[in-house]
């Protein structure tokens, strides 16, 4: 791991039980990686890729459980894409693109000497996972797509475009929680007040005497050209690149990005796909509930059997 260095800002790990690494991308930008557990565990390692404006803190609960499994300990890492979390912000917003972000993932995998791994991709992170399956299939030993598939619903993308980079600045995390609740209550009606506060703490960060978004507001440019009358090209070829490895899809039943018709089409191409339906959640499921974590734990154990024979 000569190309990865320990955290310069240990507070990024906080009290979460994870450690931080920084990796330099091909263009010199600094990429932040969270890690739970230790390399060389009995189970396959796991690489987590967050959503559009999200960062590796979204995988805190899941990462801690998977890494700390006494029977099957494993190394879990989560990559903050450029412009998110602890990674550097790009002075050229055009670099917030799939080709550049895929190159960043490959740079991190090389720097930390990651072997074949199970990839958990939320939303945009799931698209990157499908692209990785086409670009470097040997890197992947199993996949969990969190509320994403080969077809993205324009209506949902338009909803995201309405607030990404445009939310008002809260004076406290409690006020931020109320902002998020107003935006997301229809998709996440069962979340408690403390859940919204946790999400606020994973959306904004403390800067000076106030709060700022924990992502580059210029990420809004990635959605600027969305046209509800012109759906994005489907990614079926990239989805099919995952055919040789176990596959799970987590579906928020209130989602407006991944819909049932797309899941049915995915099932038609992959009869063995494991679909986990999450009630009372939309885009994207939080992966924090005990029942969801238990299902994911069982799935990654099956990936171990498939790849390692135990």
PLM region spans:
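Catalytic histidine-centered segment of alpha/beta-hydrolase-like enzymes
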Residues: 281-290
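Active-site loop/oxyanion-hole signature of alpha/beta-hydrolase fold enzymes
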Residues: 61, 67, 72-120
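Conserved hydrolase catalytic core segment
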Residues: 115-154
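Conserved alpha/beta-hydrolase catalytic His-Asp/Glu region
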Residues: 171-224
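Conserved serine/cysteine hydrolase catalytic core
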Residues: 206-265
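Conserved HGGG/HGGXW glycine-rich cap/lid loop of the alpha/beta-hydrolase fold
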Residues: 29-88, 304
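An N-terminal hydrophobic leader/cap segment in hydrolases
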Residues: 1-22, 34
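A catalytic-pocket lid/entrance helix-loop region that shapes and gates access to the active site
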Residues: 142, 148-175
């Amino acid at each position: 791991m000569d190309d990865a260095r320990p955290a310069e800002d240990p507070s990024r790990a906080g009290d979460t039980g994870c450690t931080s690494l920084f990796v330099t991308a091909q263009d010199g930008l600094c990429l932040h990686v969270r890690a739970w557990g230790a390399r060389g565990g009995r189970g396959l390692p796991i690489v987590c890729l967050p959503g559009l404006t999200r960062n590796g803190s979204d995988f805190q609960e899941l990462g801690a459980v998977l890494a700390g499994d006494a029977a099957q300990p494993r190394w879990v890492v989560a990559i903050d894409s450029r412009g998110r979390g602890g990674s550097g912000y790009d002075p050229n917003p055009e670099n917030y693109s799939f080709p550049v972000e895929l190159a960043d993932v490959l740079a991190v995998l090389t720097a930390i000497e990651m072997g074949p791994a199970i990839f958990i991709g939320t939303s945009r992170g799931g698209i990157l996972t499908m692209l990785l399956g086409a670009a470097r299939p040997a890197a992947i030993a199993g996949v969990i797509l969190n509320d994403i598939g080969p077809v993205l619903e324009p209506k949902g993308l338009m909803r995201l475009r309405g607030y990404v980079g445009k939310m008002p600045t809260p004076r406290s995390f409690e006020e931020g929680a109320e902002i998020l609740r107003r935006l997301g209550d229809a998709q996440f009606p069962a979340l408690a007040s403390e859940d919204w506060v946790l999400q606020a703490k994973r959306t904004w960060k403390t800067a000076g005497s106030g709060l700022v978004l924990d992502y580059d507001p210029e990420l809004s440019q990635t959605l600027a050209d969305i046209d509800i009358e012109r759906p994005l090209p489907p990614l079926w070829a990239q989805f099919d690149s995952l055919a040789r490895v176990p596959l799970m899809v987590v579906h928020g039943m209130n989602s407006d990005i991944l819909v049932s018709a797309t899941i049915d089409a995915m099932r038609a191409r992959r009869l063995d796909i494991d679909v986990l339906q999450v009630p009372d959640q939309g885009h994207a499921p939080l992966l924090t509930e005990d029942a969801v974590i238990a299902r994911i734990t069982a799935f990654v154990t099956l990936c171990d059997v498939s790849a390692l024979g135990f």
